[in-house]
Curated annotation (Swiss-Prot):
Matches recorded under InterPro entries: FimA_C, FimA_N, Fimbrillin
Residues of the site described as Cleavage: 46-47
Superkingdom field: Bacteria
Protein's name according to its UniProt entry: Major fimbrium subunit FimA type-3
Lineage: Bacteria, Pseudomonadati, Bacteroidota, Bacteroidia, Bacteroidales
Keywords: Cell adhesion, Cell outer membrane, Fimbrium, Lipoprotein, Membrane, Palmitate, Signal, Virulence
Residues covered by region (Important for oligomerization and fimbrium assembly): 380-389
GO molecular function: structural molecule activity
Entry annotated with the keyword Zinc: no
Record has Electron transport as a keyword: no
Length: 389
């Protein structure tokens, strides 16, 4: 009889565990209130693929804190609102996150959640499921039903009525929207350029998830290039990943859904602190003006000029320091402080090549470099950067 009783109690415990799975093992609390939260996501733009992917909320999680203690947590899938979260009345803090994947959030203190970080991954490059966060917000809950960001028709205690809580992407997007070869008069009858690959040459590996700035002081970086350079912008802590490199495809209507760039994390340039600029780069071959291969004499001359990687290899690079200050760069769209990559922004780069490139794309470019860059910044907020090389 005792064995049967214990067996039934075990089944009941398992059933309760299963019921709580969707609520992230919701903390036990004496609830006399509920909170429902509706969100506003940032504007979608055409992703590297399907147009709506960048704004997709695959999993939405709301946490309720009483001081530092997590009082409630609830997640839903494919929705922009979480309803009837059981909690207590009084002063509370709401923390909202989206697309957190397998991140363990249940039971974390408010300080622990604020200290969370993320790393740039191959999965981020698929656009769908980009992680999003909103800064913690303090609310006063009353006994009964509370609604954050709703239109007021629900009754109950309305908080921030008509103004949903906005969550923003942790990532930014950098991409070429134009690569045009228009050699200047000095080079028009001598050289041409054939693009082959696009790289995120220098990209921050980690960022914070919360804070006025998500950029941290960690000096770890990623690169999509197989070649290791020794330049002023080369990070000391540098890891190669092949998913930050891709073959070049001609930019145009036929390839509108083909990626021309990458999703990256927020970063700040501080040379003396070991923090490097984010660099997007196009690699290819320097050729004669008619597209044929350079002669051995021409390659030797180009190598001696620092344009190609060897006297028998015409590979050359055109690096663009994204959102950087340079006389070769012009910007339109939203103003973003130079030297920074800021979350939830897209940096669209129009590159005009007017002469030979460089054999070390991680060195500073000269003001007389053969490129023009125009960058458009928007939100998703966008920056258009025009570059002339």
């Amino acid at each position: 009889m005792k064995k049967t009783k214990f067996f039934l109690l075990g089944l009941a415990a398992l059933a309760m565990t299963a019921c709580n799975k969707d609520n992230e093992a919701e903390p036990v609390t004496e609830s006399n209130a509920t909170i429902s939260v509706v969100l506003k996501t940032s504007n979608p733009n055409r992703a590297f693929g399907n147009a709506g992917d960048e704004a997709k909320v695959a999993k939405l999680t709301v946490m309720v804190y009483k001081g530092e203690q997590q009082e409630a947590i609830k997640s839903v899938e494919n929705a922009i609102k979480v309803e009837n979260i059981k909690c207590g009345a009084g002063q509370r803090t709401l923390v909202v996150m989206a697309n957190t994947g397998g991140m363990e959030l249940a039971g974390k203190t408010l300080a622990e959640v604020k200290a969370l970080t993320t790393e740039l991954t191959e999965g981020n490059q698929e656009a769908a499921g980009l992680i999003m966060t909103a800064e913690p917000v303090e609310v006063t809950l009353v006994a009964g039903n509370n609604y954050y960001g709703y239109d007021g028709s629900q009754g109950g205690n309305q908080i921030s009525q008509g103004t949903p809580l906005e969550i923003k992407r942790v990532h930014a997007r950098i991409a070429f929207t134009k690569i045009e070869v228009t050699m200047s008069q000095s080079y028009a009858n001598k050289y041409n350029f054939a693009p082959e690959n696009i790289y995120a040459l220098v990209a921050k590996k980690k960022s914070n998830l919360f804070g006025a700035s998500l950029a941290n002081s960690d000096d770890a970086y990623l690169t999509g290039s197989l070649t290791t350079f020794n330049g002023a912008y080369s990070p000391a802590n540098y890891t190669h990943v092949d998913w930050l490199g891709r073959d070049y495809t001609e930019i145009g209507a036929a390839t509108v859904n083909t990626p021309k760039g990458f999703y990256v994390l927020e970063s700040t340039y501080a040379q003396n602190a070991g923090l490097r600029p984010t660099i997007l780069c196009v690699k290819g071959k320097l050729t004669k003006h008619d597209g044929t291969a350079l002669s051995s004499e021409e390659m030797t001359a180009a190598f001696n000029a620092g344009w190609i990687v060897a006297n028998n290899d015409p590979t050359t690079y055109y690096p663009v320091l994204v959102n950087f200050e340079s006389n070769n760069y012009t910007y339109t769209g939203e103003a973003v402080e130079k030297g920074k990559i800021v979350r939830n922004h897209k940096f669209d780069i129009n590159l005009t090549i007017t002469g030979p490139g460089t054999n070390n794309p991680e060195n500073p470019i000269t003001e007389s470099a053969n490129l023009n860059v125009n960058c458009v910044v928007a939100a998703w907020k966008g920056v258009v950067q025009n570059v002339i090389w």
